[in-house]
């Protein structure tokens, strides 16, 4: 909504991190809209304490403060369903930021309804994808709740102007800590941590090694490989090395192990939904292992044509999530197909972690479609008649022979 349209805005629910940007937004909303601000802080595995956000909100006179641990819901209802699809955007990006936004949008509008709030607000800039993801999610779930995006309204355009605003309005910010803060714009959750800005704005400049926070460089990783056994039930990992774990615990464990072995680093230039190209670096240790292992499990248990159909639909599914349409009929339709495909994706995958690489080295399943009697290079005892291949080839080559008989050059 535009800044001119401020009538009847009495309560606003703000997605609040406790950092510089959202602390300034909280004060700006109070002053600009003369409205009560309610804060919502989500723990989705970013690895930082979220409780300090409470003290900062209280210092600004916020009366209703929501701080919630959403790690279990995030992993169970968002990340794991997405990984059943083997979703990758533009061939590389594992959608770590994209998949976190729908849950936050969902809780924002739910809290708004609990408090009879008129609007929600977020700290996403007007250049990025997150504004789209937050707002499309809110529209899908609560079209009557308005969204306020301060970065599209105010005239604060730099970190210096934000710091000046904070000082002028006595906003509780640790200015010394902010000056020492990483030069990169970072975002983290259970699935990944992302880095943008500073030297990364030059797509030819290599990221400095001290930027990476979750993983060692592959060169510094252990010289001895580590093997893991991942147990699957209907497309989801349920245990690691025999230890039963909840989805969020699986991700914590795999992030730790993958990071130790330098797995999951990515440096890409991607096409944002809003139209521009952006360079980002990502660490996704757990996701990298999960994707490789899941494909290994599917290779044993999925029918060929079902697997190929999934592969054809995967880019569309990934694009839907990247662009912010998690709450959409097309995503629901594809999810139903994907979930059906996982009915027999059950068993164990053995992977090897070594110096930035994850390799599937074994797989087994009670629903395996691998028939050793048929596939063997030894005597198959009549399980497969090789003479049948002649008719198969003749029929599949029929159209080619007709083309050739008409004098068409197929070379």
Curated annotation (Swiss-Prot):
How is this protein annotated for GO cellular component? Answer: cytoplasm
What metabolic or biological pathway is this protein involved in?
Amino-acid biosynthesis; L-arginine biosynthesis; L-arginine from L-ornithine and carbamoyl phosphate: step 2/3
* Origin: domain of life: Bacteria
Give the GO biological process terms: argininosuccinate metabolic process; L-arginine biosynthetic process; urea cycle
Subcellular location(s): the record lists: Cytoplasm
Q: Its catalytic activity?
A: L-citrulline + L-aspartate + ATP = 2-(N(omega)-L-arginino)succinate + AMP + diphosphate + H(+)
Kindly list the positions annotated as binding ATP.
15-23, 42, 123
Q: Which residues bind L-citrulline?
A: 93, 98, 129, 133, 185, 194, 270, 282
Database matches in PROSITE patterns: ARGININOSUCCIN_SYN_1 (PS00564), ARGININOSUCCIN_SYN_2 (PS00565)
One GO MF term, please? argininosuccinate synthase activity
Q: What is its EC number?
A: 6.3.4.5
How does this protein assemble?
Homotetramer.
Family listed = Belongs to the argininosuccinate synthase family. Type 1 subfamily.
Q: What's this protein's name?
A: Argininosuccinate synthase
**Whose protein is this, by species?**
Psychrobacter sp. (strain PRwf-1)
Gene from which the chain derives: argG
């Amino acid at each position: 909504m535009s800044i001119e349209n401020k009538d009847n805005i009495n309560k606003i629910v703000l997605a609040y991190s406790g950092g510089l940007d959202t602390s300034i937004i909280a004060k700006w909303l109070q002053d600009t809209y003369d409205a009560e601000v309610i804060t919502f802080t989500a723990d989705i595995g970013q690895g930082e304490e979220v409780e300090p956000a409470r003290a900062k909100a209280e210092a600004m006179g916020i009366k209703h403060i929501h701080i919630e641990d959403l790690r279990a819901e995030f992993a169970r209802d968002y990340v794991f369903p997405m990984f059943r699809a083997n979703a990758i955007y533009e061939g590389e990006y594992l959608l770590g930021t994209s998949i976190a936004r729908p849950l936050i949008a969902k809780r924002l509008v739910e809290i708004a309804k609990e408090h009879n709030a008129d609007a929600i607000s977020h700290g996403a800039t007007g250049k990025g994808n997150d504004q789209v993801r937050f707002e499309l999610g809110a529209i899908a779930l609560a079209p009557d709740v308005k969204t306020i995006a301060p970065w599209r309204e105010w005239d604060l355009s730099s970190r210096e102007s934000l710091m000046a605003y904070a000082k002028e309005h006595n906003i509780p910010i640790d200015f010394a800590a902010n000056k020492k803060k990483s030069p990169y714009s970072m975002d983290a959750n259970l699935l990944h941590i992302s880095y943008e800005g500073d030297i990364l704005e030059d797509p030819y400049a290599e990221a400095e090694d001290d930027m990476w926070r979750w993983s060692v460089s592959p060169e510094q990783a252990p010289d001895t490989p580590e093997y893991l056994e991942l147990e699957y039930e209907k497309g989801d990992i349920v245990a690691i090395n025999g230890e039963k774990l909840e989805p969020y615990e699986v991700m914590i464990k795999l992030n730790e192990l993958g990071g130790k072995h330098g797995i999951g680093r990515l440096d890409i230039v991607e096409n944002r939904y809003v139209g521009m190209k952006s360079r980002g670096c990502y660490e996704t240790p757990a996701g990298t292992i999960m994707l490789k292992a899941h494909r290994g499990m599917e290779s044993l248990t999925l029918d060929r044509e079902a697997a190929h159909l999934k592969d054809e639909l995967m880019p569309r599914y990934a694009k839907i999530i990247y662009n912010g349409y998690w709450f959409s009929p097309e995503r629901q339709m594809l999810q139903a197909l994907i979930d059906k495909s996982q009915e027999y994706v059950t068993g164990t995958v053995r992977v090897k972690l070594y110096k930035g690489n994850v390799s599937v080295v074994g797989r087994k399943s009670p629903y395996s479609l691998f028939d050793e009697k048929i596939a063997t290079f030894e005597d198959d005892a009549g399980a497969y008649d090789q003479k049948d291949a002649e008719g198969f080839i003749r029929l599949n080559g029929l159209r080619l022979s007709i083309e050739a008989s008409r004098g068409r050059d197929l070379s």
